Design a protein with these regions (language model features):
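Conserved Class I S-adenosyl-L-methionine
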Residues: 168-248
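Class I SAM-dependent methyltransferase SAM/SAH-binding core
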Residues: 44-46, 52-95
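Tryptophan-centric aromatic hotspots in well-structured domains and transmembrane helices
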Residues: 13, 17-18, 25, 32, ...
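A short SAM/SAH-binding and catalytic strip from SAM-dependent methyltransferases
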Residues: 104-118
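Conserved class I S-adenosyl-L-methionine
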Residues: 1-40
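A short acidic, Gly/Pro-enriched loop at the edge of an enzyme's catalytic core
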Residues: 94-106
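A structural alpha-helix within SAM-dependent methyltransferase catalytic domains
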Residues: 34, 57-60, 121, 125
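Conserved catalytic/acceptor-binding region of the Class I
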Residues: 119-189
């Protein structure tokens, strides 16, 4: 099995922890992304690579009809329990099980690095009605904060602000226009004893040969920095970046 495929399949083993401990998408940011999409039951918002539904649930809470598309059955199970089987579909960015022009908007959170753009872009363009938007969202640890920077030195975490390069989200090309960037800073809180499970939801950590050493070092760093949280609660700073492009 190729390393990329091994990493892709690692998430299902930690689906419950992923669902509980991955950061939630900021509601204000998601509302701005979908502000003018005019979604209906016939033309919903489509969340591709939806995982266990962190982004899907925010879309739903804002009152937008939403359909989630996720290839991993283990990750899709929490989605189906929350949305119903008819709104949690097996598929991928390269193979979306919807008719032409079905989507008012398409979103994808923390997933573009798994995608083959040469297949995904025309497929997204197919299901998205003209004038609709495609948005790629990244949630990045803010390693401008000292203790988060130290954490990144001992744990294999790629999703951090200093690592991110705008080139990671290239221009989509035809039939899409240029990207518009929105971003928002926020903090996620969880119990310090949940930190190891939170970190295991990242494939680069879960599959590392020295994973237990990395997790022990992470707990030690949090303990050494009072500013990381209070009363046994970790306060992890993040920046969400959303890149939206309009379908011509």
């Amino acid at each position: 099995m190729r390393d990329t495929e091994r990493r892709r399949q690692s998430f299902g083993a930690w689906a419950n922890q992923y669902d509980q401990l991955r950061p939630a998408y900021p509601q204000e940011l998601v509302a701005a992304i979908l502000d003018d999409c005019q979604a209906t039951v016939e033309h919903p918002v489509v969340d591709i690579g939806a995982g266990t539904g962190q982004l899907t649930r925010v879309i739903d809470s804002l009152g937008f009809p939403v359909v989630a598309v996720e290839p991993d059955e283990r990750m899709r199970a929490p989605l189906a329990r929350g949305l119903g089987e008819e709104s949690a579909l097996a598929g991928s960015a390269e193979d979306i099980p919807l008719r032409d022009g079905a989507a008012a908007a398409v979103v994808g959170g923390q997933m573009w690095h798994w995608v083959r753009p040469e297949a995904a872009v025309p497929e997204i363009g197919r299901v998205l009605r003209p004038g609709g938007s495609m948005t790629i969202v990244w949630i990045l640890r803010d390693d401008n904060v000292r203790w988060v920077r130290e954490l990144a030195e001992v744990v294999s975490l790629p999703d951090r602000l200093s690592w991110f390069d705008g080139a990671s989200v290239p221009s989509l090309g035809d039939p899409f226009g240029p990207f518009v960037l929105r971003e928002q800073s926020f903090t996620q809180e969880f119990a310090v004893e949940q930190l190891p499970d939170h970190l295991r939801t990242y494939s680069s950590v879960a599959l590392a040969d020295d994973v237990e050493d990395q997790l022990a070092a992470a707990v030690r760093i949090v303990a050494e920095h009072p500013e990381a949280g209070v009363a046994g609660v970790v306060e992890m700073p993040f920046v969400a970046k959303a890149f939206s492009a309009r379908r011509r």
